[in-house]
Amino acid sequence: MSSTMNPVAPTAHLASDVRAGRLDPAQYAKNFCDAHPPLNVVQANIEAERCYYCYDAPCQTACPTGIDIPTFIRRIADGNLRGAARTILEENPLGGMCARVCPTEVLCEQACVRNTNESKPVEIGLLQRHATDAFFEKPGTPLFVRAADTGRRVAVVGAGPAGLACAHRLAVLGHQVVLFDARPKLGGLNEYGLASYKTVNGFAQREIEWLLSVGGIEVRCNHALGRELHLDALAAEYDAVFLGLGLAGVNTLGLGEQAGVRDAVDFIAELRQAASPADVAIGRHVVVIGGGMTAVDAAVQSRKLGAEDVSIVYRRGQESMGASADEQSWAKENGVRIIHWAAPKALRAKGGVLRGIDFARTALEGGKLVETGESLALQADMVLCAIGQSFIATVLEDGGVQLQGGRISTDTEGRSSRSKVWAGGDARFGGRDLTVEAVEDGKQAALSIDRHLRAA
């Protein structure tokens, strides 16, 4: 095990030793610093010079928001960081966060032609961060100026990546936007759902402050659809409504209630909102169920909080995991064990205290997942569930919005079956759990809403 993760002092062996403050302050600071530091000026210039500036750039095609990647990299090479940032942010107003969290290895960097001969793409994500970081440190004059006020009002419900992108584009186009969110802070996944070491020093909120500075966006937090807000009332009051609700429902193990078992998303949110990581309790033996990015974030942060033994357990093989190969490698580098082909079957507790979790070994037979008859038992005083989330359709209150596969059905522009209502992000059928795709959903919906309002 890495020495950077060792507790301050050994404690008596207790299967239920779940507590905060396992490490000393210096170790917490080290563990939760920026996990992937930015390029310095020299590194950025060298990397920018590696770009071929392709005319028909496959990297741009692979970017869900269509950022003109060759242009922004050329501007970095020319020393024009503000121009580079503008090229990025005009297509992706959350370009700073996306530079930190995008799985570039399976998007733009995978498409880079440098892979053909060198097997090493241009580090597009780090270059994007270099440009946007420089801009946010010294924004100067506004990059974007609002068009003349159209007199139209649009309600945007949900201030995650899709809602923020939609609100920003609508405001730039001259519409008045009221941005609602159920939580005390804006940002959605970017604020509550990502590992703390991916976005340090409050960057998510700093980017949102810049996004709102364009003007024309009124913010109302602690307003949830189905609680303070109702779709019929919104449709009556506003000229258009965009639903960027995300996935608020949590899938459970179905093994009954047990202290020590909690949702991984809630665990990550608690850590992101904590004044200090020292305030967050963690077990000594942590098992994370799931195979996506959330599972990796929860597992790695468990190690960084001082857990001695952390395992990710996934019911299928490595190739089926939602977490990218880079994320899986990152987990292993941080001392996380990844176990494949095992499905949770029972929790073991004694005296109401979680002691472990039992698994059935699995395999594929005829394309179906089956149990092999073999078993696996792991010691655990904390189990984190990262087995997916679901859309809570009841918030729509039978408001005439058609669902498909449990999510909101839309056309290619984000229009729902109900007049005046658009949707995007994870709540839209076909949406993937990627910040950059949610941003594109919001942007395209805003353009569609704008066309609709101008034609009316």
Name what the model sees in each region.
Residues M1-T150, V241-G260, A349-L354, A380, ...:
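Ferredoxin-type iron-sulfur electron-transfer modules and their immediate structural context
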Residues P93, G160-P161, K185, G292-T294, ...:
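Residue-level detector of alpha-helix initiation sites
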Residues H130-A148, E209-R227, V250-L305, L403-S417:
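Glycine-rich dinucleotide-binding loop and its adjacent helix/turn
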Residues A148, R153-V157, Q205-L255, A346-D358, ...:
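Feature captures the FAD/FMN-dependent oxidoreductase FAD-binding
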Residues R153-V178, A295-R303:
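N-terminal Rossmann-like FAD-binding beta1-loop-alpha1 element of flavoenzymes
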Residues V154-V156, V177, V286, V310, ...:
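Conserved hydrophobic helix-helix packing surfaces used for dimerization/oligomerization
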Residues Q176-L179, R183-S213, V219-R220, A299-A346, ...:
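Rossmann-like dinucleotide-binding cores of NAD(P)H-dependent redox enzymes
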Residues A259-G283, G367-R432:
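FAD-site-proximal beta/loop scaffold in flavoenzymes
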